[in-house]
Amino acid sequence: MHSILAVDDSASMRQMVSFTLKNAGYDVVEAVDGEDAFDKARVRDFDLVLTDQNMPRLDGLGLTRRLREHPKFRATPILILTTESSDEMKQAGRAAGATGWLVKPFDPAKLIEVIQKVVR
């Protein structure tokens, strides 16, 4: 079973993502922001990090950069969830080391489809 760290400061979004992923057979650990996610990632291995972009304390790009600085996370896929679909956001995500991104709102089936491609 693949393990996913789901990061979002919105409780309702976190619950929806977690519910969707658990129903698809994934093991899910939730984090409320980038700092919380980084703390959890240091003590447990994940097959994928799924993070919101706009969060207090440490946003998705900051979390991605911080994770990529450590050898343990260099190959871990990181998907960013964002309301921004601009080329600038995509470039910033790539520069930070993100594997990909999904624009909110998104279809839960599309989320599963993207994750299945990434964690093969």
Language model features with spans:
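Conserved acidic segment of CheY-like receiver
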Residues: H2-S12, V17-L21, V49
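Short hydrophobic/Thr-rich beta-strand motif most characteristic of the beta2 strand and flanking loop
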Residues: G25-V32, K40
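Active-site residues of response regulator receiver
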Residues: D52, T82
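Receiver (REC) domain active-site loop signature in two-component systems and cognate sites
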Residues: M55
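C-terminal output helix
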Residues: F106-I115
